[in-house]
């Protein structure tokens, strides 16, 4: 299964990479590697992560205090947020697509 990032989630990813690059050389790259590994994992096992709100699942990153918040759609995963675990919970909820008939 493939994935796509919400525009705001993509911006969060870019911001986090820049933040970690500012902390230490190469740290942003390590963050990106962790995000890519988590993305590949949920593409392979889309229902592995727990549902935390409606249909949204959270895949916690291995080495950083972030989670990928995503929805399993019929033919893809839709990543709605690259959320820092200390950030206001549910700030991304308005990014979740509406489901018809449910």
Where in this protein do the model-derived segments appear?
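A short, surface-exposed loop/turn module that caps and links secondary-structure elements
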Residues: 37-62
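Arg/Lys-rich, positively charged N-terminal/basic patches that mediate binding to nucleic acids
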Residues: 1-32, 102
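Conserved amphipathic alpha-helical interaction elements at protein-protein interfaces in regulatory
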Residues: 15, 19-22, 41-44, 48, ...
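Short, hydrophobic secondary-structure boundary micro-motifs
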Residues: 29, 50-52, 91
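Enriched for short, Lys/Arg-rich terminal
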Residues: 67, 71-102
């Amino acid at each position: 299964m493939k994935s796509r990032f919400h525009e705001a989630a993509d911006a969060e990813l870019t911001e986090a990479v820049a933040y970690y690059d500012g902390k230490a050389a190469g740290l942003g790259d390590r963050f990106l590697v962790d995000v890519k590994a988590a993305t590949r994992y949920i593409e392979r096992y889309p229902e592995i992560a727990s549902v935390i709100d409606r249909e949204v699942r959270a895949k916690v990153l291995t080495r950083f205090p972030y989670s990928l918040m995503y929805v399993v759609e019929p033919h893809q995963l839709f990543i709605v947020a690259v959320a820092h675990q200390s950030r206001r919970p549910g700030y991304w909820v308005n990014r979740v697509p509406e489901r018809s008939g449910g």
